[in-house]
Amino acid sequence: MLALLACVLTLLIASALGSKPLIDTLMRLAIFGLYAVSLNILVGYTGLVSFGHAMFFGFGAYAFGLLMQTGVTSLPAAALASLALSAALALIVGALCIRLADIYFSFLTLAFQMLLHAVILSWVSLTGGDQGLQGGIPRPRFLGINLADPWQVFVVTTVVFFASLLAIRTILQSPFGYALRMVRDNAPRAAALGLPVQRYKLAAFVIAGLFGALAGILMALYVSGAYPNFAFWTLSGEGMFMIMLGGIGVFLGPVLGAAIFLLLNDTVTRFTEYNGMVMGVVLLVVVLGLRQGLLDVVMARLRPR
Amino acid sequence: MVDSGFGRPVFGSPGRRSVLKAGLVAGATLSMPFVARGASKQPIRIGQPSILSGRLAQLGISSRNAAQMVVDAFNAAGGLDGRTIELISRDSKGKPDEAARVVRELINNDGCQIILDSEASSGAFAVQEVVRETGTLCIHADSETTSLTADPKIRAPNAFRCARQVLHDSIVGGSYAAGIAKAQGLKRWMTCSPDYVYGRDSSSEFLDYLKMFEPSVEAVGATWPKLFAPDYTENVTRILETKPQALYSALYSGDLVSFIDQGNLYGLFDQVKFFAINMADYTTLHAVKKLPAGIYSCNRYLSTFPATKSNAEWSAAYDKRYNVLPLNWAWQNALAMQFLVEAIKKTGSDDGKVLAGALRGMTVESPFGAKGTVTMRAEDQTIVDYAIGWGVTIPQAPFVEGMQAADWTVIAARETEWKKQKGWA
Amino acid sequence: MSSALAVEGIDVFYDASQILFGVDLAMRAGEIVALLGRNGAGKSTTFKAIAGIAPPRRGRVRFGERDLAGLPPHRIARAGIGYVPEDRQVFPEHSVEDNLAIGAKPGPAGQRFWTISTVYEVLPELHRLRARAAGRLSGGEQQMLTIARALMGNPDLLLLDEPTEGLAPVVVERIMALLHRLRTMGMTVLLAEQNMFFCVDVADEIVIIDKGQIVHRDTAERLSQDEEIKRRYLAV
Amino acid sequence: MNLDAFAGCLSSASCLITQTSAGLIIGMLLFLVACGVTLIFGVLGVINFAHGAFYMLGAYLALTAYQLTDSYLAAVLCAAAGVGLFGVAFDRLFMSRVYNSNVLMQLLVCYAFVLILDDAVKMIWGAEFQSMGMPAVFALRPLHVFGGLVPPFYVFLVAVTVAIAIALGGLIERTLFGKIVRAAAVNRQMVSALGINTSLLYASVFGLGALLAGAAGALAAPVRSATPGMGVSILIESFIVTVIGGMGSIAGAFTAAVLLGLVRSFGSIGFPLFTDGLMFGLMVIVLLIRPQGLFARGSA
Amino acid sequence: MTAHLAIADLVKHFGGVVATDHVTLDFPPGSLTAVIGPNGAGKSTLFNLITGRIRPDGGQVLLDGADIAGLAETAIVARGIGRAFQIASLFPSFTVAESLAAAILAHRRQTHRMLTRFPLAAARGRADEVMHLVGLDAHADRLAQHLSHGDQKLLDIALALALDPGVLLLDEPTAGMGRDERWQIIETVHRLWSARRMTMIFIEHDMDIVFKIAQSVRVLKYGRVLAEGTPAEIRDNDEVIAAYLGARYAKAAP
């Protein structure tokens, strides 16, 4: 209900203001917010520190873009097919990665991501290499929706974003979600209570990959293309940045983190080309000063002992 | 309000909700500074997305410098009935999605009516998609990838290109190299270009035209260092192993310098004739501490080619103002901005459609023209008749001598043929 | 001999759980005191608190003129306290001689009585094993090595945590002999033990710890006669 | 894929020699950077993601020192010392605060420094790429060895790297400092209880790792142009080396670096368009089969 | 009387060290047994072997006559062996009620449900029951990480109880506690046992507690069974006394 309300409210505010920059900002926020939330399913809720989450963002974007460009006539069908492919990828990569513990898990996810990145760069005939998918992504009408119209793209993105948040939240609030937290908090104890820990790690990996890919699909729609840096390690790093900024212990923390990250990025690039310097300093202050995300701090203050 | 079941609110508690809202409101206010802008005598805003940080930062910086010089001259001369041009350059960090965002922001947020795109190719394609959607007038000033304006699927009526093209360079390079191959008996050719689309296109098209102009040559191998590779040892040894008589490379900037430094160690350039299309650009020429004599190169930018007074003056003015010599990207952006300024003056308008109409087929006088002028070809909205030439390096200024200028009638003929083959013309 | 240890009312916690409850313990220089108690009574924690590894939340650790509580372990070691942990903690991939070399340092007054050669003199078996990786020594040899490693730091006070645990009787005898020798050299030793009879043999005084508190203190002779105390705190 | 060329090279002595020596050279430069990463991880348990940035700093410091003194030796020493000191400060002021935190915190502190240092270099030295040029002593013709070509500068580089590897191995294996460092890697608390200031020890190890990165940047400066952001690709490659060799093993890093160098030099013949993919593929395979690396905790 | 849980000839090596050396023990249904022994006697290893956290090198673990040795930990838990740990092993970010509900759902294999809200009503009711049983009702909504040490130990036991186990293994339930807290927790444990008559095995160092509540005692030393019997028998067993006071010197002592 609340998600629906927030969704309608967002759309109303946006249409009332009718401001294109606001719409752009909100769309990017929805994309990166969803991406960060999906990463946080792993990092925050399951305790799996993936260095390679952008792999799914990039894969989703490319799969969708390529399907649309190579003649799938229905946009929802292409999106669903891309999601299915991404889930299959996540299943395979995840099954291999979760066998490893701690830092080795992280490294293996990174290695797989860089492998995908290398494939995207090398397979020029399919992916366009470093120049990305060119010529735009066709947007045939479906169900009366015309995604060639920016406003309708915005509406669809917003609806998908809130629906995804609702879905992720439902999952995280379900017995399944609590099982993931058990794995995060104390995997050996969870096993001693009869929980098949590895299976749950894998399921979390696939779900996170799925929503990461969905964010990638939205991104492909937004920029009307797909680029290798969608699957580059820097985007994985920025995902971490976002969730650390906003807070990994609170559901909406990553969304806030994404919002701050984007606003900071957009504002700083307006005034200086030394964007990295500013972002680096902010990151240092958050990590060394607060030692947790903003919403984590707020929640820690609010919670009675 | 939804509870977790044990009385602990987890989602949408008032605290977090208001934080989120505050963020949105802050975002909205930050994003709309133009709301308060006055209406009279407002400047004509031109947005320039470019790479100002990271390994390609000098691309953006020289682009910005050159465009700013033209803008300043226009404003100093009184602008358009007192209306000045404001150039807003913004960093995309070389990421295509960020370039798309910056362009949207420049258009929607900063009220730019015109986009001067100073992105590398991948960014340019992203910018192209944005301006296709918004209909904003756009000139790409740095992307050399031919398909951007040649491929009917990709080009857009409101988007122009004011930059050299891989195809043009390849035709010229092929014909120049064919002449030398014939004279010196260079039969075995090899390529060493960066492993990305520009490098691959450049190598294959160069070889195509080389073979067309001199059928006796054969390509005996190719090696593909990756972009920004620190190390070229394996490529150098690969070339030595293959023992070609001549080598073509589309490496540029720091990568080309590293390649030359590392090739020198093996005495590579004593053993093969080296055709480096991107050698003749000042930072590259200066950065190579021991520039081998006898490297064949196309001009990227040289103040001595075309050997005209106006070219030398422009170069000197740039050097004086920025204390650095101009690069290839500088002349392209200077010219692009000149096209815009002349279109504005000619039409007295800042309307994109009107300006686009004026730009199509426009010819301007320019130090960078092969014969003193450059034309924005109407059919595919890209420039022709700019100066292209090949020469040979010498270790000291002016670094390149024996420049042979290209013949644009040959280029035009071959280009038409090529487009027909592709089904684009 | 002026240096003496005085532990005053220390409380030690591991996270939420309190292990020591106001432990007091004083000893004079040149004395051998045994801290006796069952598994989990708090002996090791007391030692870790003194050595700075588990800093006390409350209380003081006076050593000579200084309060060591809260100092990092290396400062406490340099103040003249040599620590031999209960599970020995040799550096397993290092040779015996390297283990000793890592422990080498002058004492707090700059004395360098204990060197590799004096240690080998006292413990000739270590000389024989000097090139062997410490991880491949037997339990008794490892115990000798950790004591020797602590001696290499020329301490004024030696903390020996359960030196006989899990060792064969013949090895226990060797350690006993070593302690007698150290006593004649004037070394101050605080010893943690579960083994009553070992304590009676080597210690001047015995302090009994139970459930994180000091419950009894007496001379070794008197305590060995006290069946009630023995049954209550030590036997089953 | 070009398997004919690959087979052709394998059957030609001069090709084998040239490509093997090329692989060695690539491997040596990789090792120089990777050994710092592996040293810092082996002792401190910290993955130094800022190591590539240290390498960049080394290259720039060397460039400036060379311009000022015209002495390559001074340039290398200056870069090594400068970056080493920077590493010590970085450890004491920033990293030491997150030693006890999770990997994520450490990663983010390093990431912050990658961003900051890239921009700092741009501010100080400018955005244009710069090249040091070959010092006159090394501007010699390449040597011919059994039909293969080997440049003298690379002979020097290989010699220096092998010397550094041996010195580092000796330092870690033979000296008291090395013994203490190895002991601290196993049991920091016990080392501390023996009177050794482990904070200082950690800082010095971090400084040593940084010094090696600085030296690597300086040693590579004559043949690699310097630009802001140049550390990234080196960082990724040295991570592959570190992971394949086994985190913490100097010998492992050396072996893996040579292995990777050979993969690159022969891969450029057999699979010219996918050498990057080959390296990541190798990393994936090693992680799957032997996650602790080929030489888990070998000599360090 | 057949044993509820029986261990036959169990062996476990770690490297060259024998941690469990041909141990044979049995525990009758509804018995309350203490396992004692010096450090390193193999008590915790024994628990790990029973619950399948580590695999035995040889021997059998018989639950109601069926061999469960070598099964996965989750499979063994499913057969009704619950376990609490020496250092309370909890889910720090869960409230007490959430911890228990999660444990119940995990045990009932209902954690795969993604669309229902946690906790299911049935689990919640059962969680309330268990909370009441161990007396943690008042702390239902406090986070596990914020509980006192004693309450953390209780919660750890409650997690095991939530599985409604036939056999409950408690590893040092009183470790790290003050005098009064110890007795509180031990009273709770004893009350649970007498109310529910499950087979309960606990490791303990506090002999006062052992002798007060245990029906029978097993003594381990160096991975072997040294003695077994009633508290009174153990108290007077010379070998046991010697093991604690030092073997070589036991006879020499006056």
Where are these regions (language model features)?
Chain B
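N-terminal secretory signal peptides
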Residues: 1-18, 22, 27-29
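Extracytoplasmic "Venus flytrap"
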Residues: 47-66, 90-96, 119-120, 192-201, ...
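Beta-alpha junction/loop-to-helix N-cap segments that form part of ligand/metal-binding clefts
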Residues: 58-65, 80-150, 162, 224-233, ...
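Signal peptide-proximal N-terminal region
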Residues: 65-87, 212-215
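Extracellular/periplasmic Venus flytrap/periplasmic-binding protein
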Residues: 98-101, 146-147, 156-265, 304-313
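Periplasmic-binding protein-like
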Residues: 106, 110-119, 139-141, 190-192, ...
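Extracellular/periplasmic periplasmic-binding protein-like sensory domains
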Residues: 156, 263-334, 345-348, 405-424
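Solvent-exposed, acidic/polar segments of extracytosolic/periplasmic ligand-binding ectodomains
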Residues: 293, 363-425
